[in-house]
Amino acid sequence: MKLPKTIGLVHFIGIGGIGMSGIAEVLHNLGHKVQGSDQADSANVQRLRDKGIEVFVGHRAENLGEAEVVVVSTAIKKSNPELIAAREKLLPVVRRAEMLAELMRFRNAIAIGGTHGKTTTTSLVATLLEAGGLDPTVINGGIINAYGTNARMGEGEWMVVEADESDGTFLKLPADVAVITNIDPEHLDHYGNFDAVRAAFRQFVENVPFYGFGVMCLDHPEVQSLVGRIEDRKIITYGENPQADVRFKNVRIDGTRSIFDVEIRRRRTGQVIELKGLVMPMPGRHNISNATAAIAVANRLGISSADIAKGLASFGGVKRRFTLTGEWNGVQIFDDYGHHPVEIKAVLRAARESCKGRVIAVHQPHRFSRLASLFEEFAACFNDADSIFLAPVYAAGEDPIEGIDSVSLVSRIKSGGHRDARFLTSAEFLPQMVAEVAKPGDFVVLLGAGSITSWAAALPKQLEGLSGKSV
């Protein structure tokens, strides 16, 4: 039985969330009646309103109105007044992943999983499928610059979704194609231990039907190990590894562009397809790896090499993924969502390869628990930055942990041999600190999942305001 058009008004609690908003938008585009609520106004909320979706600010029982179905994310607490009211009315309460799974049943589905790189890879797969004329429906975990939104309603038979592993619900998604970019010990508050994370990703691939396939990164040791344990499913490997079925090589970085070749080898026939001189307007080996995953999917779906090259060259990127927010005095300023040591290291390596001058990193750690569990990894992930400014931890509702703060992290980074790590007491001092050290040709990269994105947006004008003043 498929999702009927007669389910009535669907109410989303927390509709402004990046995962919830995309599902709400696609449901609305399919002709369902949709409304929702969120704690605060936001760009996502306004975007949904512009499409005719009613959104209430604040959570109150009366917001449900005539709703017949309620959708919630795992972030919504049992004490939420709207959730309490829904259960009192005996309304069906649907988890975000369950509703996403229902939408996926209408299409052949590609689910992009992994602890890092999901959003960019989802966007790249969508871009290549669009270039190949497949007109996909897309639900992503970030704003795709070409769409100005995180969702796209297509007329084709394929759907591309980001599969969020954080709460285990990605295992509910009925994917025909499953992509795994990497596997790191994340979300242990939910899983309990790393073995449980490994088991979840194995099940994610093995859930694919016999006529589907998995696409797995051979450069990541955990994923390579998993490849050897998958039985009775077709697997396509990718990466820089010479043993990969779809391999990238001959990488050249030209400013903020990546130029590379890809070799596709068919195991059964021995056929080799070469894609030479591919251009992607985004730097970094991690992004080339993500692009190679997308190429593996696109090639398998029959998209021509010419369309793959055309789509890749047109890729407009994802909001908050090495996004240029402005320039000042020959200094380029970038905003990036990176908040895990693996992500930070990859972004700064890309900046180092692209930059003619020095790299200045500004980081706002996200959550005390993450900083505590990965303290040594954070201390070692900034080596490609010439200067580091560390802001206070963005708590995200957590209580402080004694001895775990940015001052301690600065001290640990310095003791590890870094020449210039400093504590940034608050955002108001950032323009002055940047102006004192930045020179023409330098990159300033602001990284984090908290409020730092607003600093990145404001910094170019703030620096202009300092021009003419003594610094």
From Swiss-Prot:
Keywords: ATP-binding, Cell cycle, Cell division, Cell shape, Cell wall biogenesis/degradation, Cytoplasm, Ligase, Nucleotide-binding, Peptidoglycan synthesis. Its main location: cytoplasm. ATP binds at residues 114-120. One of its GO terms (biological process) is peptidoglycan biosynthetic process. Cell wall formation. It is an enzyme of class 6 (ligase). Pathway: Cell wall biogenesis; peptidoglycan biosynthesis. Its EC number is 6.3.2.8. The keyword Protein transport does not apply. It catalyses: UDP-N-acetyl-alpha-D-muramate + L-alanine + ATP = UDP-N-acetyl-alpha-D-muramoyl-L-alanine + ADP + phosphate + H(+). GO terms for molecular function: ATP binding; UDP-N-acetylmuramate-L-alanine ligase activity. It holds the Pfam family Mur_ligase_C. Belongs to the MurCDEF family. One of its GO terms (cellular component) is cytoplasm. This is UDP-N-acetylmuramate--L-alanine ligase. PANTHER family: UDP-N-ACETYLMURAMATE--L-ALANINE LIGASE, UDP-N-ACETYLMURAMATE--L-ALANINE LIGASE-RELATED. It is found in: Cytoplasm. The keyword Nucleotide-binding applies.
